């Protein structure tokens, strides 16, 4: 279906925030559940999706304390793992909600000097795109470490790409440079 290419897919958006990714997934036909540890984020997401008459199930929870029996075709962990204290535990908790052969996407920040300069010094202190203290460089995750944790939780790496932000046109592009942002695709085995 061209209008709803994600029809019949169940998606879990972990760390959904205000629903910025949950909403377009729902509009593309997916059955979306969005979870976030912040009740304020969940309230904002519900309010916004209700105004658009979208059927998104928002729950205030983290994957570690989520009490549902559902299994999902796709799990989105977008820009969240660099904020958790134990990435391995987080991936373990997340992966238990993934169907066999299901896909998990993880977008995060690499642990490099360049990522420190761009994501913290540049984005927080110089450009003020983010509040100061949003990121802790110690929590950034190298792709090799993420792969190790994923493989230990029955997830096979399918692909890893760099995500490059172009400040001139305000767009993200997929590329080879993983030194700042990257996105990994894993499959449940």
Question: What kind of feature is each model-predicted range?
Answer:
Residues 2-4, 9-116, 143-146, 184-188:
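Conserved SAM-binding loop
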Residues 48-54, 121-122, 172-176:
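Short low-complexity, flexible loop/linker segments enriched in glycine and/or proline
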Residues 108, 128-145:
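Acceptor-substrate binding/catalytic loop of class I
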Residues 111, 165-167:
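Residue-level marker for beta-strand->alpha-helix junctions and adjacent short loops that shape enzyme
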Residues 116-125:
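Short, flexible, mixed-charge acidic loops at enzyme active sites
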Residues 138-154, 160:
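Short alpha-helix
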Residues 171-189:
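Core SAM-dependent methyltransferase catalytic element
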């Amino acid at each position: 279906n061209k209008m709803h290419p994600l029809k019949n897919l169940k998606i879990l958006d972990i760390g959904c925030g205000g629903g910025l990714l949950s909403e377009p997934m729902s509009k593309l036909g997916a059955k979306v559940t969005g979870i976030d540890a912040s009740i304020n984020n969940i309230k904002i997401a519900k309010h916004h999706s209700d105004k658009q008459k979208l059927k998104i199930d928002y729950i205030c929870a983290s994957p570690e304390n989520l009490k549902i029996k559902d299994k999902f075709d796709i799990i989105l962990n977008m820009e969240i793992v660099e904020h958790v204290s134990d990435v391995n535990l987080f991936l373990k908790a997340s992966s238990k909600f993934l169907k066999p052969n299901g896909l998990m996407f993880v977008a995060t920040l690499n642990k490099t000097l360049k990522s420190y300069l761009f994501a913290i010094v540049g984005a927080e202190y110089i450009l003020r795109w983010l509040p100061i203290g949003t990121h802790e460089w110690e929590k950034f995750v190298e792709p090799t470490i993420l792969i190790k944790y994923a493989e230990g939780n029955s997830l096979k790496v399918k692909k890893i790409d760099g995500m490059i932000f172009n400040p001139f046109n305000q767009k993200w592009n997929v590329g080879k440079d993983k030194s700042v942002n990257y996105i990994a695709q894993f499959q449940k085995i």
